[in-house]
Amino acid sequence: MPVEQYLALDDTTDGLYEYWHGLVLMLRPPSSVSLEEAFVDMAGGSPTHAALSARLASLIDQGLPQDSLCVVYSSDVRLKLAEDHYLHPDVTVSCTEQAEGVLTHPTVIIEVLSPNTEKRDRSAKLTAYKALPSLQEYLLIGSEEKEIIVYRRENDWRPYHYNEGDSVELASLGVSFPFDAVYRRIRLA
């Protein structure tokens, strides 16, 4: 599918789609399609996935200084990696002004792992995101087990694993939050 068709599809339906070098991946079917009709494996979609995404966005937003220029975005906002590559990360934080309707300069990207996306989030997306000059930190959040991994540009993208009782540090934002707060009252899948 040409990129123009993808952009029209993503802009004109209430479904959510990613565009990976010519391939369209459905993340959320449009409301006009029943789940039985949506025969492709969709990303996320579980209550656990949604709760973790919302919790992380809230913890980061609450931790930002009042005078911060950073804005926290949900997966509803499209991220442009290249002319033929658009994704919808679960949570994106950008600290620079963005064009209307599309993010291009993320500072932090968060993906909540699910069985359908984990391999892609840990490999292909990690590689693609690392190529973004503005990106400073990439987080992977477990939805089946308590797991938080942070990759940092300043650390040559080596993974840092956080555990229960730790304080998760997002140095690029000057934000920290308790590991345990991420999973509080959330039942894992």
Model-inferred region functions:
Residues M1-A189:
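Gly/Pro/Ser/Thr-rich low-complexity, intrinsically disordered segments predominantly at protein N-termini
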